[in-house]
């Protein structure tokens, strides 16, 4: 939205800057909640030794050939993940990685994030890439008993723990250009970053809170909170590198 000239600056007050890590905000928009894009695995088919030191980069290793499910290249979650790889590893390296990922896919990409988790539960693949809140949503029973049962058959794994950390993305708020009540809009963002609002958000979306001192939903807590988040890669780079990400995925034959 900022790139299209739809947002204005102004989210620079001290309360916002102190609440939100700098990689999750700019003067035009700010993260309100976080989600991690992680790996889900079948514990009966994937060993601890295979997972040791697993990174997004190593998902292209030939040992995972025919074992991986992930969404299509037109999905924004995947575009952001691949954009982060372009930022950290370069376009050429990420192009090679994309080809490895396509080679390792158990099937052509189809369905949403929950469909990837369901595929692992059904034995169609051994590992899936999906956002954290989807597993919690399935475990909650809100998507029905079949998805709840399937979710219990997989385990979460947080990649890149020995390096930059697990890929994080945000739900955010921005200031629309020309908004007549800029001062009140900033106050709304401040409220969304309050303990009261953060508790409401995380217990309804299954995301991670943006501010310290607020606990996620118990189903998210059960997935583990002691993991290293990627605080190095600024979210703004996901947009800047999006076209490169889509280019390398398309060239690799990532449907």
Model-derived features: positions:
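Periplasmic solute-binding protein
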Residues: 1-6, 24-51, 83, 168-173
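Short beta-strand->loop
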Residues: 7-15, 29-30, 57, 145-167, ...
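A structural signal for short loop-to-beta-strand junctions that line the ligand-binding cleft
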Residues: 7-39, 57, 67-70
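Short helix-loop capping/hinge motifs at secondary-structure junctions, enriched
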Residues: 44-53, 86-95, 179-185
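Short loop->beta-strand "edge-of-pocket" segments that line small-molecule binding or catalytic clefts
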Residues: 57-76, 84-86
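Ligand-binding pocket segment of bilobal, Venus flytrap-like solute-binding proteins
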Residues: 73, 77-80, 84-159
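Mature extracytoplasmic/periplasmic domains
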Residues: 171-232
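Extracellular/periplasmic bilobal clamshell ligand-binding domains
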Residues: 216-255
